[in-house]
Amino acid sequence: RLREIQDASKHPLRFRVSMEHFDEDKNDTIRGKGAYRKAIAGITCLAEVGFSPILTVTRTWKEECDSEMESQFVEVLRKSGVKQPQIKILPGFLLGQLAENERNYSQDEYVTEKCFEDFDITQLQCATSRMATGEGVYVCPILVDNPAARMGNSLGDTLRPFPLSHSACYTCRVTGMTCKSIP
């Protein structure tokens, strides 16, 4: 069915699958038991119908190891049948398990208007995209567990600006990170 939808659309259909590690045990320590196998099954299913999902991972290693880690993740995608492996490495957002393992955001880690004075706001995914889930449509994939980031039930409900008030917005700004899949 996904292939039919893609073939009928003038816009590309892209999928991103989130994992934390190429090792099953290390991934499941963060994502929960069985998460690795579910992700691999989803990646394999998408590859079988001709899609090349983008693998999104959160950096839990030193930045200088990015190249080595990316190679390992590319190998996981290739073994799953993905013809054009793409990896998106995100900085650590102090949310969920990472906040439990390390720390929460401090009172000083938030965005202000000054943060965006000489910054192209369209570089942030929230300026041009939304995250649709079974629970509604959210401003950002990082904030799908935050009820305040839920914008409505349909894409039509989200055709409006959203205040950049969450500390995760701070991480995007100070790291120069963008969730966009295409450079």
Regions found by a protein language model. Give the residues of each.
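Radical SAM/AdoMet-radical enzyme domain recognition
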Residues: R1-R59
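A short secondary-structure junction signal
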Residues: D28-T29, D66-E68, I142
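Well-ordered, non-membrane alpha-helical segments in soluble/globular domains
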Residues: A35-R37, S67-E75
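Structural recognition of alpha->loop->beta junctions
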Residues: R3-V17, Q72-L90
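Accessory C-terminal segments flanking Radical SAM cores
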Residues: L95-P183
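Flexible glycine/acidic-rich beta-alpha junction loops that bind and position SAM and/or redox cofactors
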Residues: R59-D66, K83-D108
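Short secondary-structure transition/capping segments
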Residues: R1-R3, D66-M69
